[in-house]
A protein has these predicted regions:
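Short, amphipathic alpha-helical segments that act as regulatory/interfacial helices
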Residues: 284-291, 366, 370-377
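Alpha-helical recognition segments enriched in aromatics with Gly/Pro capping
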Residues: 47, 75-87, 194-197, 201-350
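Short capping micro-motif at the N-terminus of alpha-helices
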Residues: 1-2, 41-43, 92, 141-142, ...
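Residue patterns forming the tRNA-binding/recognition surfaces of aminoacyl-tRNA synthetases
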Residues: 53-207, 314, 320-366, 370-371
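NTP-handling and nucleic-acid-processing catalytic cores
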Residues: 1-86, 158-191, 225-229, 252-266
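Conserved small/polar residues in nucleotide/adenosyl-binding loops
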Residues: 383-388
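Short hydrophobic-aromatic micro-motifs
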Residues: 1-3, 8-11, 15-17, 57-60, ...
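Proline-centered turn/helix-capping motifs that create local helix->coil transitions or kinks
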Residues: 121, 294-296, 373-382
Length: 390
């Protein structure tokens, strides 16, 4: 088999071959032996294995690769997590590898495979590696316990209200984006390992049993009833996904779950104005949560506006350094020039590619209009120079 990540070898729990690959299909149902460990690996038939890539046989490491995880679920393969939180090889590997940084482990594994005559060849291979937006570090899939929402169940009503025109999109073409995402929705991971956010309202008992509660007092009462005695609890250290918290915004800001006068007056609202890039992040999730908790859609219409991108059509972001500050443009070229630029480029559903040169051209054009207008007014008998200045 070929791999770009030899360091994950100790987490391999299977080998996949394409069931239509004449070279390998006779081996399906048999076992291969994992080098350096001697563990038996079942050979499974799965279309994830591409006969035209490499040897056509793929090592499956369900705990450290997203695609392999899905293959593992389909074939009930074991999950073996081989890294600790520092990216070092843990105790699941042979002792000589334990504690090694994953990249140093890569080198040692290759050396040991070669020493045993098990390394066929090494070659350069170009492929896409995921990097952290802020850290710039290589991202490694890592198996952890997380909280999930059954988004498939919630999506059914959300699809229904748009199909029945209880919620409409403008431009209507964006409904396709909405439907495509909801009809193929996956379980939604709502727990995050970050500093900022709403703490997950889960407390754990001495045996790690979880208790969902409104607050710690409520959790302690539930735990006491369960254990028949008072116990200490520890709250889950994770926080909720920002988009989960945001999905509750239309009604949580109005005093829900209480039937406040604000909730009765302002929920549901009429119109939501937003960009297409968060139709599934926010719009769909607000609709799902609104229908689930209040039995009403949170709004009646969704107006999708364009995104303002840089001159190359890329989305503006701080990490790319391509953000154009509207305040700086206004200070340099004037608010009328910026308004005219955006108005002239805007059309329903189409993004705007903005550059400072466009705003400068609009400023020059606006100056000509201004000067022409002053010239006309100064030459009208009914106007004075003071009126022209105004």
């Amino acid at each position: 088999v070929a791999t770009t990540r030899p360091e994950t070898l100790f987490g391999d729990t299977g080998v996949a071959v394409n069931p239509n690959d004449e070279r390998w299909k006779r081996f399906i149902g048999k076992n291969a032996i994992l080098p350096l460990v001697g563990r038996k690996l079942p050979i499974v038939g799965d279309e994830h294995a591409d006969p035209d890539q490499g040897s056509g046989a793929v090592k499956i490491t369900p705990a450290h690769d997203f695609n392999d995880f899905e293959v593992g679920l389909r074939h009930k393969l074991n999950l073996i997590s081989i890294f600790d939180k520092e990216g070092k090889i843990n105790e699941t590997a042979p002792k000589s590898y334990q504690g090694l940084d994953r990249l140093k482990a890569r080198e040692k594994i290759l050396e040991d495979l070669e020493a045993q005559g098990l390394l066929e060849k090494k070659e350069k291979y170009e492929y896409t590696i995921p990097f952290g937006d802020r850290s710039g570090e290589i991202l490694e899939p890592f198996l952890t316990d997380q909280w999930f929402v059954d988004a498939k169940k919630l999506s059914k009503e959300a699809i229904k209200v748009v199909k029945e025109k209880k919620i409409t999109f403008f431009p209507q073409s964006w409904e396709k984006t909405y439907f495509d995402w909801l009809e193929n929705i996956q379980p939604w991971c709502i727990s995050r390992q970050i500093w900022w956010g709403h703490k997950i309202p889960i407390w754990y008992g001495p045996d790690k049993k979880p208790f969902a509660a409104m607050d710690e007092k409520d959790a302690l009462n539930k735990a006491e009833k369960f254990y028949k005695k008072k116990v200490s609890l520890v709250q889950d250290p994770d926080v909720l996904d920002t988009w989960f918290s945001s999905s509750l915004w239309p009604f949580s800001t109005l005093g829900w779950p209480e039937q406040t006068k604000e909730f009765k007056k302002y929920y549901p609202t009429n119109l939501l104005i937003t960009g297409f890039d968060i139709i599934f992040f926010w719009v769909a999730r607000m609709i799902m949560m609104g229908l689930f908790f209040t039995k009403k859609p949170p709004f009646k219409e969704v107006y999708i506006h364009a995104l303002i991108r840089d001159e190359k059509g890329q989305k503006m972001s701080k990490s790319k350094g391509n953000v154009i500050d509207p305040l700086e443009l206004t200070n340099k070229y004037g608010s009328d020039a910026l308004r005219f630029t955006l108005s002239s480029l805007a059309s329903p559903g189409r993004d705007i590619k903005l550059s400072t040169q466009q705003v400068e051209s609009s400023r020059n054009f606006s100056t000509k209009i201004w000067n022409a207008s002053r010239y006309i007014l100064l030459n009208c008998l009914l106007y004075t120079s003071d009126a022209a200045d105004e």
